[in-house]
Swiss-Prot record:
EC number annotated for this UniProt entry: 3.6.4.12
Subunit structure: Homohexamer; the central pore (25-31 Angstroms) is large enough to hold dsDNA. In PDB:5F4H two of the 6 subunits are in an ATP-binding competent conformation. Interacts with Holliday junction resolvase Hjc; in the presence of HJ DNA this interaction decreases branch migration but not Y-DNA unwinding. Interacts with helicase Hjm (hel308) which decreases the DNA helicase activity of Hjm.
Record's keyword terms, sorted: ATP-binding, DNA damage, DNA recombination, DNA repair, DNA-binding, Hydrolase, Nucleotide-binding
Record PANTHER family: AAA FAMILY ATPASE, MEMBRANE PROTEIN
Originating species: Saccharolobus islandicus (strain REY15A)
Cofactor binding: number and manner: Ca(2+) stimulates ATPase activity more than Mn(2+) or Mg(2+).
Domain notes from UniProt: The C-terminus (residues 434-505) forms a novel KH fold; this domain binds ssDNA but is not sufficient on its own to interact with Hjm. It is probably destabilized in the homohexamer.
GO-annotated biological processes: DNA recombination; DNA repair
UniProt protein name: Holliday junction branch migration ATPase PINA
Function summary: Promotes Holliday junction (HJ) branch migration and unwinds Y-shaped DNA (but not replication forks or dsDNA) in an ATP hydrolysis-dependent manner. Stimulates cleavage by HJ resolvase Hjc. Unwinds Y-shaped and 3'-flap DNA substrates. In the absence of other proteins stabilizes replication forks (prevents spontaneous unwinding); Hjc, Hjm (Hel308) and PINA coordinate HJ migration and cleavage of replication forks in a coordinated way. Inhibits the 5'-3' (but not 3'-5') helicase activity of helicase Hjm (Hel308) on overhang DNA.
Effect recorded for residue 325 to A: Loss of ATPase activity
GO MF term list: ATP binding; DNA binding; four-way junction helicase activity; hydrolase activity
Additional detail: A triple mutation (Arg-147-Lys/Ile-199-Ser/Arg-206-Ala) forms monomers rather than hexamers where the PIN and helicase domains are in very different positions than in wild-type protein, see PDB:5YWW.
Gene this chain is encoded by: pina
CC cofactor: Ca(2+)
């Protein structure tokens, strides 16, 4: 009887099924170095190692049942990778390596080692039985009933799929099945593996697996796009279509989670491709379903600097940046936009103004219109608001005196052409102010506020009955010091005005 040396890829491929069905036969060997590697990885919280160790236990049970040997072999004191030590052992003892790894197969060919390359078994995925045409996502967690989110973006409900809670072994079995299927289904890959979590793109499914200690139990979330739209399906305003074709190069697609931002970004990327533009994407994970003409880059497999260099050298007309979350993401968007690359960013936000706030805190006001020119807000799968940004020099709405003119970014509703918000620097703070609720303040009030607010931030200034009244909160009266009194007296004398102090209740 042959001796079969299993590698990690065989364990993750579900080799126990092949043994149980009689597709491969022989004594089962596992090298000590592989067990040591799996132990280290499991202690580091890697889900794949946990799944591989579960498979080892399953193999031990099956070999006892079908009466073949199960043996841990080799010398774990030798230094080297588990695959390398397994090959050395097989060369010495004449064993057959069982693998599902193309690289391992090529090395065995080169070294003249016998191998058995596992071919996929024709079988479906058990979790697919939970999906129907309306299912957006499946939520499985140990000791709870499986649930599904059904409907469409912005109009969905949670549905229990069973009355019986799933056991930890059931959840782990589904996780095992998913990891095994990564090598079988075209377009599948492990996107990220961290301590306690695993993110997989499995064909059309995006899978997130978590385990203790990261989560309080084994949990699997599987999402699937319910709708795939073309840009024409959104029935967009002709003015927006024209802007997207001719002017928009700093685009932000904003919306709450699950509202259809990525679906719209996907439709826009395909639209630009049909216009003959070169389009690339940056994703984490890569879950957009796009034609092969559009290259999709993963943020998890490259440093931000590397992506920056690649995108500048490959000269795309547009780059779609899905899921912008942290400072690095926004910095890359800004750098590429200022370098002349058309950018489409996807941002979580509860309103279009919240999306602009994310940039206001990171860049100078003067560069905002060069970075952003079009904000598209998605709600319930549809475009609900479009803003454009333009820079001008004017007195902000609500300020009265002509010498308060300053650079102002106007945020206009594309549909009406009306300015709804203004961005400008007030004192030392960059503010986004609704035009219909602007700050009403004269030049003198502004000067007094600037002096007082440096020392008493919560104080307010108003003009009434021929006097300028400074209203100070009672708890901050201690900050009203001699230096401030002297400055206000000088201002009174110089401008022939009267300033009065009043405590707020």
């Amino acid at each position: 009887m042959n001796d079969l040396m299993l590698d990690k890829s065989a364990l993750l491929f579900g080799v126990s099924k092949y043994l149980e069905k009689g597709i491969i036969t022989g004594n089962v060997l596992i090298h000590k170095s592989l067990l040591a590697e799996l132990e280290r990885e499991s202690n580091d919280g890697l889900v794949s190692a946990e799944i591989a160790l579960d498979e080892v236990k399953k193999l031990k049970d099956i070999t006892e049942r079908i009466l073949v040997n199960f043996e841990i072999v080799g010398d774990d004191s030798k230094k080297g990778e588990a695959n390398e030590l397994s090959r050395e052992y097989c060369l010495e003892k004449g064993c057959i390596i069982v693998t599902a790894d193309e690289t391992q197969k090529k090395i065995c060919d080169a070294m003249g080692i016998q191998y058995n390359f596992l071919q996929p078994l024709k079988q479906g995925l058990s979790f697919e039985s939970f999906f129907d045409d309306e299912t957006m996502s499946l939520h499985i967690k140990e000791d709870t009933v499986p649930r599904a989110k059904k409907g469409k973006p912005g109009n969905w409900k949670f549905v229990n799929l069973s009355d019986k809670p799933m056991l930890s072994t059931d959840v782990r079995m589904i996780a095992n099945e998913i990891i095994n299927a990564v090598r079988l289904i075209k377009g599948s890959f492990v996107e990220i593996e961290r301590r306690g979590s695993l993110i997989i793109q499995l064909g059309n499914y995006r899978v997130v697996i978590t385990r203790p200690p990261l989560s309080d139990g084994w949990e699997i979330t599987i999402t699937r796009p319910v709708v795939r739209k073309r840009l024409e399906d959104y029935n967009l305003d002709e003015r927006l279509i024209k802007r997207l074709e001719e002017r928009a190069e700093g685009i932000i697609i904003a919306g709450a989670p699950g509202m259809g931002k990525t679906t719209f970004a996907q439709a826009l990327a395909e639209y630009y491709m049909r216009l003959g533009k070169i389009v690339k994407t940056i994703e984490s994970p890569r879950d957009m379903h796009l034609p092969p003409e559009i290259t999709q880059y993963s943020k998890n497999y490259a440093e931000i600097g590397e992506l920056h260099d690649i995108l500048l050298l490959s000269r795309p007309d547009y780059t779609v940046y899905d899921e912008m979350r942290n400072d690095e993401d926004f910095k890359l968007y800004v750098d590429l936009r200022l370098a002349g690359v058309g950018m489409v960013g996807v941002v979580h936000a509860t309103s279009p103004i919240d999306a602009i706030h994310r940039f206001v805190n990171r860049v100078d006001i003067g560069t905002i219109p060069n970075i952003l020119d079009t904000i598209i807000f998605i709600n319930s799968g549809n475009v609900s608001k479009v803003y454009t940004l333009e820079m001008t020099v004017k007195v902000p709405a609500g300020l009265k005196e002509a010498d308060l003119a300053r650079p102002v970014v106007e945020i206009k509703d594309l549909a009406t052409g009306n300015t709804e918000y203004e961005i400008y620097v007030f004192g030392e703070q960059t503010m986004i102010v609704p035009v219909n609720r602007g700050i009403t303040m004269s030049n003198m009030e502004f000067k007094i506020s600037k002096i007082v607010n440096n020392i008493i931030p919560n104080a307010t200034v108003k003009y009434e009955d021929g006097e300028y009244v400074i209203v100070i909160p009672k708890e901050e009266i201690g900050k009203y010091n001699r230096k401030l009194v002297q400055r206000l007296k000088r201002l009174e004398k110089k401008n022939n005005i009267k300033i009065k102090i009043k405590l707020s209740d």
